[in-house]
Amino acid sequence: MASVGTLPASSMATKQSNASICAEKLPEGINEMKIKDDKEMEAAVVDGNGTETGHIIVTTIGGKNGQPKQTISYMAERIVGQGSFGIVFQAKCLETGETVAIKKVLQDKRYKNRELQTMRLLDHPNVVSLKHCFFSTTEKDELYLNLVLEYVPETVYRVSKHYSRANQRMPIIYVKLYTYQICRALAYIHGGVGVCHRDIKPQNLLVNPHTHQVKLCDFGSAKVLVKGEPNISYICSRYYRAPELIFGATEYTTTIDIWSAGCVLAELLLGQPLFPGESGVDQLVEIIKVLGTPTREEIKCMNPNYTEFKFPQIKAHPWHKIFHKRTPPEAVDLVSRLLQYSPNLRSTAMEAIVHPFFDELRDPNTRLPNGRALPPLFNFKPQELKGASLELLSKLIPDHARKQCSFLAL
């Protein structure tokens, strides 16, 4: 069994003199930990009152393939997220000085954790990476899973709010960068791994405010969708829910993420949500006010059980009238391709990436507003490009970036 434990901050003073200790406390319920070893994961963890601000969590990882086990110590710093799932807190690795995010979720002992299984499949520059994980228990014998993730300081939600509060529009270069990277993450999880995220929203899109690299996070709702197998329809946050989910469809596809991405793009252009419904029905009303009443054929594509339902007949509102007149027409066109009633008519994530709206990102002379280089956009892996036509590849990877994809014979 790996050795685990906690130490008071004072006993590690020499290691963490530069660590900032925040006044904010973590919930007391997770401060009474017992040892829990997970044989399958070969990563153990936490003993004692380890997650109170300023306390040290000591865990042992590794030991696979004859490698020596390694002790890692984390100092809990502050809560960065809270929800029905549990909490996310920021911590500092005392050996390396690296800041991490630790997501702590209640684990049903009868099941494997789907989020953990999903995270282990993922390796992509636009997806938050899992460093390692450990289990812990409270005195009530509740089991918690702790996912140690890379820390990214901002979210697209907060960046967008910053501009809207200042009564400004987000610079279009950022809209392009964020949307491109969202679509690239989706192309990878949909095509490369077969996973549907099911909760795409600005709060789940992390962004580095210096490089503007975006990383998709929170795979707590993610699932590998299997054709013919039903799924729950009450999934995804309301403003970003695809209409087939509102109609109660259970055999939906990864195109629900595409709808959500379209909602995010529209929100970045508008400075506010496009479909701000107060309830499920109200959400549908907001969508109909923009897209018009769905045709019988479109309803059939979303949920065949509703084809006889009588909807108020409303004409579609022209897309160009929804956005500010200075909004690039390519942006409006892309929104219209992502927000289609019929799931099979929505652009795929890969089709979205090659849309002309993103041509500026493929120009070797394009820079961030501060003059810095753009974040990595073309470092594709073979897994991302499987099945892509030569025509698509030629649009996807500009000449100046071909060296990054040396495995392609372009």
From Swiss-Prot:
Q: How is it modified after translation?
A: Autophosphorylated mainly on threonine and serine residues.
Q: What is its EC number?
A: 2.7.11.1
**Protein kinase domain location:** 74-358
**What top-level class of enzyme does the UniProt entry assign?**
transferase
Active site annotation, chain numbering: 199
Residues annotated as binding ATP are: 80-88, 103
Look up keyword Nucleotide-binding and say if it applies.
yes
As its record notes, the protein acts as a catalyst of: L-seryl-[protein] + ATP = O-phospho-L-seryl-[protein] + ADP + H(+); L-threonyl-[protein] + ATP = O-phospho-L-threonyl-[protein] + ADP + H(+)
> Keywords for this entry?
Acetylation, ATP-binding, Kinase, Nucleotide-binding, Phosphoprotein, Serine/threonine-protein kinase, Transferase
**CDD domains attached here?**
STKc_GSK3
Residues bearing Phosphotyrosine? 234
State the superkingdom: Eukaryota
Keyword Kinase listed: yes
Q: Which residues carry this modification: N-acetylalanine?
A: 2
Record note on quaternary structure: Binds to KIB1.
> What family does this chain come from, according to its entry?
Belongs to the protein kinase superfamily. CMGC Ser/Thr protein kinase family. GSK-3 subfamily.
Name of this protein: Shaggy-related protein kinase epsilon
The organism's taxonomy opens as:
Eukaryota, Viridiplantae, Streptophyta, Embryophyta, Tracheophyta
